[in-house]
Design a protein with these regions (language model features):
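N-terminal membrane topogenesis motif
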Residues: 1-26, 79-86, 121-123, 199, ...
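Alpha-helical transmembrane segments of multi-pass membrane transport and lipid-handling proteins
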Residues: 89-116, 169-176, 197, 301-357, ...
Length: 514
């Protein structure tokens, strides 16, 4: 099966899994909120971020191992694959124990993150449930890196779908019958354990040539590459945590735990949609790694430009829909106005997400090319600026200040420096072409958002659902019409259209088989 076929299959099947998971997640979240309230939502988000600090000890080993597996898998060098996976397994056993011990110690600092007066019933059990789930992943999930690097992750989708359905149904039943957060988390732990066991069993059977307990030594060049990449990823992991996991901490500490719960609803929808988009980029990462290894610099840059346009087209569409539909959906359709932020805060959240989306091609190319050391300082500097700016701005602007701080951090670090590394180290050409495209995409994105938002604000229909449908139509048509009119003659647009046609063909073939 070709790289393209594998990438398409990865995308289609994983997309289907994500859509089903999203629908189940919305139903589960709705039941959760109406039975347990937003405080428990805030607790879940906060604990995830607090314990996320412990995953720094992973030090980017999964990413480095995944990159190192591309070549031996392509060459069917199973001795090298076995050696790499054995090192990976041993490292994760050590890390799992470190995380467990560190988590127990960190528990005694929980009152710093959540004042005792704000801690709902079951907080202690919830903390250790989250900790156990985190540790479980280190002991049981390492093999999934192998199947992902082999561009075969789609084969795990049936397992994921069945277990996601079972977990969601079981959790809803527990909430309705017992109204108990402890039992809700217990179901999650049991299902996580089962899904990891099933995935492990499948991967072990599929890769019979791989000895996960191999005593084979790594080749000198493999050791050197791993050390170099892990060295660059250590700072990146710390920085990424501080950038991505401190928002809830700051909101809880300087605003309220309830505000964290409200934000978690926006985050749920954002993560659902971003999950679909990330599936597209993740499904082609292994293929991009192959392109970087064998194609010319011109071809690499051409592929990157296509990825960048795809990111703009998709994330611009997403940003317009988020800006116009977030509050109408959450406030009017789903939960009520008490669970929404003001328009300015939503706008800042959307802009932050849009800029993150535009960086996705850089992250994908960086992972495929293995350029980890060259910009290792970026996440750390990004994190410091983000933290300082967010703490200052949150006192002045409230929740919006947290996300504005993230935007400031990204513009002053990753957004201007990371492209230099990719263009100089991978494409061996000037980075100015990238900056021109990037600025143009930001301006066009803002233009799309403003036009669509003004159009939606003009909609004054008495019936809420009818008005919401009209806003959906406006939000969808504005970016589609503007961007199609501007780019329909470009090769990047044609490449996106061909990709869409291939995906639709694959979906139709799957439906016809069923």
């Amino acid at each position: 099966m070709s790289r393209l076929e594998n990438s398409t299959k990865n995308f289609v099947l994983t997309l289907g899994n994500n859509i089903l998971s999203s629908l189940l997640g919305l139903v589960s979240r709705t039941v959760f909120i109406y039975i347990l309230g937003s405080t428990y939502l805030g607790l879940a988000g906060l604990l995830g971020n607090v314990l996320g600090f412990l995953t720094i000890s992973e030090l980017g080993i999964a990413t480095a191992i995944g990159f190192s597996l591309y070549k031996p898998l392509a060459e069917k060098d199973y001795k090298s694959v076995s050696a790499l996976m054995s090192v990976y397994r041993k490292a994760y056993v050590i890390i799992g124990n470190i995380v467990l011990i560190s988590g127990i110690i960190l528990f005694f600092s929980l009152d710093f993150f959540i004042a005792p007066s704000q801690q709902p019933k079951g907080t202690t059990f919830a903390y250790f449930a989250f900790l156990f789930n985190t540790v479980l992943g280190y002991f049981l999930s390492y093999k999934t890196t192998l199947i992902s690097s082999d561009n075969q992750a789609f084969r795990l989708v049936p397992i994921n779908i069945v277990m996601n359905v079972m977990q969601t149904v079981a959790q809803i039943i527990v909430l309705v019958l017992f109204k108990n957060y402890t039992l809700y988390l217990s179901v999650q732990i049991v299902c996580s354990f089962i899904i990891m066991l099933l995935q492990n069993r499948y991967i072990t059977r599929k890769y019979k040539e791989v000895d996960f307990y191999s005593k084979e030594e790594l080749k000198p060049e493999q050791k050197s590459s791993l050390k170099r990449n892990i060295g660059g990823l250590i700072i990146a992991k710390i920085g990424d945590y501080l950038v991505n996991s401190t928002d809830n901490l700051i909101i809880t500490k300087l605003v309220t735990l309830a505000a964290t719960g409200i934000y978690s609803n926006y985050l749920l929808i954002r993560n659902m949609v971003n999950g679909y988009i990330s599936t597209l980029f993740a499904s082609v990462t292994a293929g991009i790694g192959n392109v970087v290894a064998v194609e010319s610099d011109e071809r690499k840059e051409e592929v990157f430009n296509i990825m960048m346009f795809c990111a703009y087209f998709i994330y611009c569409f997403e940003a317009v829909c988020f800006l116009c539909l977030f509050n109408p959906f959450i406030g009017d359709i789903w939960l009520g106005e008490n669970f929404t932020f003001n328009t300015f805060t939503v706008f800042i959240i959307v802009i932050n997400n849009y800029l993150t989306g535009l960086r996705m091609p850089l992250i994908t190319m960086k992972g495929a090319a293995g350029t980890y050391m060259e910009d290792a300082w970026i996440p750390f500097a990004f994190a410091i600026i983000n933290l300082v700016a967010s703490i200052i701005l949150v006192k002045w602007m409230g929740v919006a200040g947290v996300f504005l701080g993230t935007i400031v951090g990204s513009l002053l670090t990753a957004d201007w420096y990371r492209p230099i590394i990719i263009y100089h180290k991978v494409f061996h050409t000037s980075v100015m072409k990238y900056y021109k495209r990037y600025i143009a995409y930001i301006v066009l994105g803002l233009l799309n958002m403003c036009i669509a938002y003004v159009g939606c604000e003009l909609v004054k229909i008495k019936f809420v659902f009818v008005g919401f449908i009209v806003k959906i139509i406006i939000s969808a048509l504005v970016p589609l019409i503007i961007n199609t009119a501007l780019f329909y003659r470009t090769k990047e647009f044609n490449a996106l259209k061909e990709m869409g046609n291939r995906i639709l063909t694959k979906i139709k073939s799957k439906l016809s088989l069923n």
